[in-house]
């Protein structure tokens, strides 16, 4: 019972202890106040027999108890985190983490979340050699388009980790996991399913958690339900063996429809799948800039779909003061445009569904792929060209129709 309360890391348990201290201190302070009032109310009858020192002790003790052991623990201890949270997030809307009775399918959730985090997520871990006085815990943040708020809430509810922040006047939302339990849970879920150089950040996060758990006897007792994370190697299994590519595509992939009106050849509607990632993952370590290449994972994806891997170079104008400063970005790109190879893309994403709003684009995209595969390119009524034109009216960036029925009973949940 003693260990239950003294070693608890639950915020509600800690708040209850603060309230208990405040109540006990309030009772003691009230008793002192009563003695002081009796002493002052009867000048001719000295209850303390003229002991001025004892009277002064009671006055000072009453003030200390009521201010530092009643008011501060009750208000700051019991409500401090809530007040600070509200004041620091005036520009954010925090979405409720509703409690759903969902069971996780780790074999599918792990790869999907790994792909999602390796695409649009970050795992931030302070360097152990940092000279900063303030040490902070690992932080996991996943960025979603504003249209994918439903997915962010779904994953937050499913894993019971973190909170979803909707930024005011921004076109994105953030799923942020900062508490120890949440970070520990998510690192365990994606352990063994990472495929890109971001694995390096995962390892640092897992090592931080292991070192923190074993740092002191008190910490170890507090976190006795948390075992050390047994760090697994990079996942080198076949791309089609799990949902990793679905998570990565929800982050950085897209399904496009091009309408090609050529002069020397007939007009065509061209559906294609594209995934583009930067070429290198950079990490500053002891003033040494270490590069890790994305070539191997992108080559594996290209091989899976039997297409070529392309290298792309782009110059971005940084607009520094009045001078045009350019920064060159290098990326690898996988593009599947062949009709028969698009069928394999369909087979994969029918098995491991996308969960973002891109799922709706994929369904429309699939209609065009199936029509072209069955009937070929056609400018006729109800042909591929007409279908492509109609689909593009509510598609990708122009989409205004969103449904989320595909988030009910997903393959990420046990069945």
Swiss-Prot record:
Effect of residue 60 to A: In strain: Capensis / YB4237
Pfam families: COX1, LAGLIDADG_1
Biological process per Gene Ontology, one example term: intron homing
Post-translational modification as stated in the protein's UniProt record: The mature protein may arise from proteolytic cleavage of an in-frame translation of some COX1 exons plus the intron containing the aI3 open reading frame.
Keyword flag Hydrolase: yes
Subcellular location: Mitochondrion; Membrane
Keywords: Endonuclease, Hydrolase, Intron homing, Membrane, Mitochondrion, mRNA processing, mRNA splicing, Nuclease, Transmembrane, Transmembrane helix
pH dependence: Optimum pH is 8.0.
InterPro entries linked to this entry: Cyt_c_oxase-like_su1_dom, Cyt_c_oxase-like_su1_sf, Cyt_C_Oxase_1, Homing_endonucl, LAGLIDADG_dom, LAGLIDADG_Endonuclease
Cofactor requirements of the protein: Mg(2+)
Enzyme Commission code(s) on record: 3.1.-.-
Chain segments annotated as transmembrane: 16-36, 57-77
Region feature (COX1 exons 1 to 3 encoded): 1-81
Region annotation (COX1 intron 3 encoded) ranges: 82-415
Keyword match Metal-binding: no
Record GO terms (molecular function): cytochrome-c oxidase activity; endonuclease activity; heme binding
GO cellular component terms, semicolon-separated: mitochondrion; respiratory chain complex IV
Main location: mitochondrion
Membrane disposition: Multi-pass membrane protein
Remarks, miscellaneous: Strain Capensis / YB4237 has two stop codons in position 276 and 407, which disrupt the gene coding for this protein. Consequently, the corresponding intron containing its coding sequence is not mobile.
Family: In the C-terminal section; belongs to the LAGLIDADG endonuclease family.
Function: Mitochondrial DNA endonuclease involved in intron homing. It introduces a specific double-strand break in the DNA of the COX1 gene and thus mediates the insertion of an intron, containing its own coding sequence (group I intron), into an intronless gene. Recognizes with high specificity and cleaves the sequence 5'-GGTTTTGGTAACTATTTATTAC-3'.
Protein name: Intron-encoded DNA endonuclease aI3
Organism expressing this protein natively: Saccharomyces cerevisiae (strain ATCC 204508 / S288c) (Baker's yeast)
Name of the gene: AI3
